[in-house]
A protein has these predicted regions:
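Transmembrane-helix boundary and interhelical linker motifs in polytopic inner-membrane proteins
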Residues: 4-13, 45-46, 62-100, 119-124, ...
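Signature of the first transmembrane helix
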Residues: 13-78, 108-112, 177-178, 240-260
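Interhelical loop/hinge segments that connect adjacent transmembrane helices in multipass membrane
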Residues: 1-15, 192-198, 210-253
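Alpha-helical transmembrane segments of multi-pass membrane proteins
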Residues: 125-150, 167, 171, 179, ...
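Alpha-helical transmembrane segments of multi-pass membrane transporters/permeases
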Residues: 16-28, 137, 142, 156-182, ...
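Residue-level recognition of pore/gate-forming positions within transmembrane alpha-helices
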Residues: 26, 30, 57-60, 95, ...
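Short membrane-interface helical motifs at transmembrane helix boundaries
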Residues: 42, 108-127
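Membrane-interface helix-loop junctions in multi-pass transport and translocation proteins
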Residues: 41-43, 47-48, 161-164, 175-208, ...
């Protein structure tokens, strides 16, 4: 009985600690993001800021899509951790990574084919900013991809309830974006191109940090070939309706930006 009480006590402490950590993270991110938006608007100007919002909306979309997929991955991780199925954990990680890689290829093909046409014909962009807008599209696309590829690693961190790592990395992410915004107008380069390229590099760095933490902390975060089709179907079906709902919400928000 004492062991049971000890486990309950440890679990309660962990929940309380994670709650406080995530609350502190939310406060920091809220204030930093508010100031970052102010710097970006001042640095880009109204015209370039509008172009950025219309084209780089794919980055906003990636946040929504990745959260849905991360939730699905975390659910399968947590279930297997509870049952102490070590081999199953590695299979879930590998399948999740395969799905993210497949989605990445699909998005690259889609936006490389449709994206340039969309920017040049459907969006109202001054001809003098067209080249910068096309470059921004490429940078935004790969920022999206790097965010997508973080999912299996973030899912493992969530499932193991190590919210401190997540809070630290996401705070680092937010502060670096603030520094990037502060650099607008100070580099001597085209501000729109600089901002898109810097955000892409920052997304790559954050992805590498998550990968490094997960691979060092969790034995299951090692890739293995998985041919079990049932697991692929389960992951897809669990995230399906949430994914459609998130995609609809993003489409409504970003669709308004494009129309305006």
């Amino acid at each position: 009985m004492s062991e049971r009480h000890k486990d309950i006590s440890n679990s309660s402490k962990r929940i309380a600690t994670n709650t406080l950590v995530l609350f502190a993270r939310m406060l920091v991110l809220t204030f930093v993001n508010l100031y970052t938006v102010r710097l970006v608007l001042a640095g880009l100007g109204t015209e370039d800021y509008g172009i950025f919002n219309a084209i780089a909306g794919v980055v906003t979309a990636s946040t929504c899509i990745s959260s849905v997929l991360a939730l699905s991955t975390q659910r399968f991780y947590s279930y297997s951790i509870g049952k102490r199925e070590t081999e199953r954990l590695q299979e879930i990680f590998s399948v999740s990574l395969n799905i993210c890689l497949l989605l990445s290829v699909c998005f690259i093909l889609l936006f490389e084919i449709v994206g340039p046409w969309l920017v040049s014909t459907l969006l109202t962009i001054p001809q003098s900013r067209m080249e910068a807008a096309q470059l921004l599209l490429q940078f935004s696309l790969f920022s999206f991809i790097f965010t997508l590829l973080q999912i299996p690693f973030i899912g493992a961190i969530f499932a193991h309830e190590n919210m401190g790592y997540y809070a630290l990395v996401s705070t680092f992410d937010c502060i670096v974006k603030l520094l990037i915004a502060y650099g607008l107008g100070r580099t001597g380069n085209d501000n729109l191109v600089y901002y898109g390229a810097a955000l892409m590099i920052e997304s790559l760095v954050v992805m590498i940090i998550y990968m490094t933490i997960a691979r060092r902390k969790y034995a299951e975060c090692q890739y293995a070939i998985v041919r079990e089709k049932v697991l692929y179907k389960e992951l897809f079906s669990f995230s399906g309706w949430s994914f459609y709902g998130a995609l609809a919400g993003v489409g409504m928000t970003q669709g308004s930006s494009v129309i305006l």
